[in-house]
């Protein structure tokens, strides 16, 4: 049987899962965030640090030790096809073999269900567990199965909940509806939300009332409570792990700040344009403000008074660090409805010539920033609030 076991691993292209004393230091350790007892556990860190590995291992152990099932969620249906998910639990095949007392040596995935199974040396399934230990679902198609009871689940995983390429319309509410379908009236479910450090202004943070996420230090866990409610949310910004250090220093040590997400787990950002010259007070022809994700951006339409730059017209964006009194005559882009004519939610709302000018300059990408972090706020505002992708 030992020879069959090794042959199966060679055929599956997966190494046996042999935990060692060094494992918690080499890869991400789920124990600290589990110790919080939070209902929602958000784990954010560098790529390939073991986030998904750790939670999937937890699902396997929960099934064998406590007879509890799991659920794996992604944003899009295409991400949960057999082609993309068949090998999700392969790193844990030896653990499965041991916990099942040598009954199961593989995992079978079909019809959005993972089952333990036994395969022979030819790779044929000779026995299968009738009960799925983990089911899958996608947010973008969840309305099709709304109200369907797929059985009790305990550990729910939303993998890659953050993205730089845009979110579904009303995604947070759709995610909550999907959770409602999975959890139903059961009170023992735990929700893990996993992501790489790709976007510190993710809309989930605002929707869940998670403040100062950008202030978290690596290795820190913040726990949020909600008044007298039993709801708790823990957010962990993963510390750098040993397993990725050597690869990172060998392949990704170029002098590019964007690569720090890969090398150290730092937040990813782009390099945004800076003003081409010093902006004088007399160059500013219009001021407006953008309110987004607990941030207030001050924006200035600049038309240079210098002869050599007299044709330049652009928007300069920087953080508004001081308190201001915004009157009804100031252009402001807000997150919620306002009865003030000058305060609008969308760029397409253009009640004045000033609004039209702002829209035109943004369309032409005639925008520069005080720093990259401000550029990230602006980019996310454009993408999430305006449905516009320029960077």
Regions found by a protein language model. Give the residues of each.
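Phosphate/NTP-binding elements of NTP-utilizing enzymes
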Residues: 2-391
């Amino acid at each position: 049987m030992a020879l069959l076991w090794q042959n199966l691993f060679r055929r599956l292209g997966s190494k046996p899962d042999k935990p060692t004393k060094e494992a918690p230091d080499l890869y991400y350790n789920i124990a600290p965030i589990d110790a919080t007892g939070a209902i929602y556990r958000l784990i954010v860190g560098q790529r390939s640090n073991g986030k998904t590995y750790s939670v999937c291992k937890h699902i396997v152990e929960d099934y064998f030790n406590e007879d509890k099932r799991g659920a794996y969620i992604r944003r899009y249906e295409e991400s949960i096809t057999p082609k993309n998910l068949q090998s999700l639990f392969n790193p844990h095949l030896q653990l499965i073999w041991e916990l099942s007392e040598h009954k199961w040596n593989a995992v079978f995935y079909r019809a959005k269900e993972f089952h333990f199974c036994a395969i022979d040396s030819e790779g044929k399934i000779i026995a299968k567990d009738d009960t799925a230990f983990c089911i899958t679902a996608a947010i973008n198609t969840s309305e099709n199965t709304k109200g369907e009871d797929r059985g009790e689940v305990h550990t729910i995983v939303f993998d890659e909940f953050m993205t730089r390429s845009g979110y579904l319309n009303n995604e947070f509410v759709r995610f909550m509806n999907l959770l409602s379908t999975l959890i139903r009236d059961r009170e023992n479910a735990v929700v893990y939300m996993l992501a790489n450090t790709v976007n510190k202004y993710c809309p989930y943070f605002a929707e869940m009332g998670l403040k100062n996420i950008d202030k978290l230090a690596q290795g820190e866990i913040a726990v949020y409570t909600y008044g007298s409610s039993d709801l708790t949310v823990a957010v962990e910004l993963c510390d750098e792990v040993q397993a990725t250090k050597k690869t990172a220093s060998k392949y990704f040590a170029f002098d590019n700040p964007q690569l720090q997400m890969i090398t150290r787990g730092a937040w990813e950002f782009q390099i945004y344009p800076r003003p081409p010259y010093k902006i004088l007070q007399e160059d500013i022809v219009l001021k407006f403000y953008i309110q987004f994700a607990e941030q207030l951006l001050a924006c200035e339409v600049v038309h240079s008074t210098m002869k050599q730059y007299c044709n330049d017209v652009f928007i300069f964006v920087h953080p508004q660090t001081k308190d201001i009194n915004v009157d009804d005559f100031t252009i402001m882009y807000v997150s919620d409805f306002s009865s003030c004519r000058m305060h609008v939610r969308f760029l397409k709302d253009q009640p004045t010539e000033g609004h039209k000018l702002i829209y035109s300059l943004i369309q032409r990408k005639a925008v520069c920033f005080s720093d990259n972090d401000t550029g990230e706020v602006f980019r996310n505002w454009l993408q999430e609030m305006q449905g516009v992708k320029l960077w």
